[in-house]
A protein has these predicted regions:
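FIC/Doc superfamily catalytic core
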Residues: 1-208
């Protein structure tokens, strides 16, 4: 995988391949906004991304910067990946599908750097479970981004904690499978590992 704007456009086209929308594989042509929902369920603007006419060049820049930094091996990929994803989200290059694309790119870049846990445990489910933490980290890291004065550390910490949690879940799953127990016992064991509320999907992840 060579990370380029064209590669990202191809992924986006595949993502929207079965959609009635004709936006797949195309950068945005109208201004978009990153919105969030408050405690009362009301939408508000969290961040205003780059304008459409700046998008293509910005995507080219961040792809080149990531590839160059990765090749120099001075910074660990686990730091470079969150920085790239943060820039991607600030640019918000597509009219729709930016969140899904960011998680797909996160998984693919982790694969390329040897972190394969996304094949077995969904990073998407982690984001959904901790949506407030995601938006808080993103909002904090986006302050000053347009002026090059952002502090991306909150987003790096968020993504690293998500990756760590995913590996812990994977380890729990391996422990359950390695014991070769019955399906019923496996489910009981999985439930015992959970504290507080949990969903059926979370238990299914632990019981392949």
């Amino acid at each position: 995988i060579t990370l380029t704007p064209n590669y990202i456009l191809q992924l986006h086209k595949i993502l929207f391949g079965h959609s009635a929308k004709s936006i797949g594989g195309k950068f945005k042509n109208v201004q978009n906004y990153i919105n969030a929902t408050d405690a009362d369920g009301k939408y508000y603007t969290l961040f205003t991304p780059l304008a459409p006419d700046e998008t293509s060049m910005a995507m080219n820049v961040i792809c080149k910067q990531y590839t160059l930094a990765l090749g120099q091996e001075a910074v660990d990929p686990l730091i470079l990946i969150p920085v790239f994803i943060h820039d991607f989200l600030c640019i918000h290059p597509f009219s729709d599908g930016n969140g899904r694309m960011s998680r797909l790119l996160t998984t693919l870049l982790l694969y390329k750097s040897g972190y394969m846990v996304g094949k077995y445990i969904s990073l998407e489910s982690k984001k959904k479970k901790n949506k407030d933490l995601y938006y808080d980290a993103l909002a904090a890291a986006q302050i000053g981004w347009h002026d090059g004065k952002e502090n991306v550390v909150p987003f790096i910490k968020y993504l690293l904690s998500t990756i760590i949690a995913t590996y812990r879940n994977f380890e729990e799953r391996l422990e359950l499978v390695s014991e070769k127990m019955s399906a019923l016992v496996m489910v009981r064991k999985a439930v015992q590992t959970k504290i507080g509320k949990f969903t059926k999907a979370e238990i299914c992840e632990l019981c392949p």
